[in-house]
Regions:
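Conserved donor NDP-sugar-binding/catalytic core segment of glycosyltransferases
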Residues: 38-73, 150
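Acidic donor-binding segment of Leloir-type glycosyltransferases
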Residues: 1-8
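Membrane-embedded multi-pass helical conduit in multi-pass membrane proteins
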Residues: 195-270
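Glycine-rich, basic loop-to-helix element that forms the pyrophosphate-binding segment
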Residues: 8-25, 46
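Short, flexible, basic/aromatic active-site loop/helix in glycosyltransferases
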Residues: 60-63, 75-94
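Conserved nucleotide-sugar donor-binding
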Residues: 26-27, 99-111
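Short aromatic/hydrophobic "clamp" motif used to bind/position activated sugar donors
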Residues: 30
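Catalytic donor/gating beta->alpha subdomain of glycosyltransferases that bind UDP-sugars
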Residues: 114-182
Length: 274
């Protein structure tokens, strides 16, 4: 497949780079791939097949179930992403720039990626998806369109990225648009799972003083497992008990710091409104 490499005069950020690429492209379909992913064989055929349907304006795929880095944090993060994309609604309300296609006319009608707001990698693709969806563009998720993620995560980079570049800007986006998506990892059971995680955080210190509260802790742990049992079974299959237990703990941590990000984003939104 012929390729053209564009060199920008200065570092302008991920959104600007994608927009310049879209402007230089000549085809009807724009296909975005992150630099740290590898498209699975047959991926382009799936893109062409889905985008040949005139009612589809955009589509995106998923990470595969075999991430490149085998550390617990990296495997948990990538497998959690894989799991939620594999079990979400096929009719989507957002977009994913790591592996996503959009009709050229729809992309430019929506204004492309927001270069002023998102210079660093963040939720620029999600925000574009909101505008596409708000403009009546049909976006579909194809779970079989998969890429292997090559990124290595550690705990510090995971928490910092999820809070600063995801939870906070995502909260601002929700408030600006007046609606919260209900697919992917924002389904109602995931919101309930976050509340269970918070209840665990409160119950465990109390149980250290009052042993009877350990029954409450046990019940909450069962509920926490049940709410994400599919994900934990996937982790067990891919990495054994060590990854399953580590993933369970990381998932509870994810809920807690995401709620902190939600609170911070809400505070920023209301202070801006003053």
């Amino acid at each position: 497949m012929p390729k053209t490499v564009l060199e920008l005069p200065q570092h302008a950020g991920v959104s600007a780079a994608r927009n310049r690429g879209a402007e230089a492209a000549r085809g009807e379909i724009l296909f975005f791939l992150d630099a740290d992913v590898v498209l699975a064989p047959g991926g382009m055929r799936r893109v062409f097949a889905t985008m040949s349907r005139p009612e589809v304006g955009a589509l995106f795929g998923s990470y595969d179930a075999d991430p490149d880095d085998v550390s617990i944090v990296s495997r948990f993060k990538n497998l959690a992403h894989h799991y939620f994309h594999q079990h979400s609604q096929l009719e989507a309300t957002t977009f994913w720039g790591a592996c996503g296609a959009v009709r050229r006319k729809c992309f430019f009608a929506a204004g492309g990626f927001d270069e002023k707001r998102f210079k660093l990698p963040s939720i620029e693709d999600v925000e574009l998806g909101y505008r596409l969806n708000g403009g009546g563009v049909r976006i579909v998720l194809d779970p079989e369109l998969q890429v292997k993620h090559l990124k290595k995560w550690n705990l510090a980079s995971l928490v910092a990225t999820d809070v600063v570049r995801r939870a906070i800007p995502w909260t601002l986006l929700w408030m600006e648009h007046g609606r919260v998506q209900t697919d992917l990892n924002f389904s109602y059971d995931q919101r309930f799972a976050a509340m269970v995680s918070f209840a665990l955080l409160l119950a465990i210190p109390v149980a250290l003083v009052n042993p009877y509260i350990w029954f409450v802790v046990g019940a909450l742990l069962v509920v926490a497992y049940r709410l994400n049992r599919g994900l934990f079974r996937l982790l067990l299959t891919k990495g054994g008990l060590r990854l399953a237990i580590g993933g369970f703990l990381l998932q509870q941590l994810y809920y807690l710091y995401s709620m902190i990000g939600l609170a911070m984003g809400s505070a920023i939104y209301f202070f801006r409104a003053l």
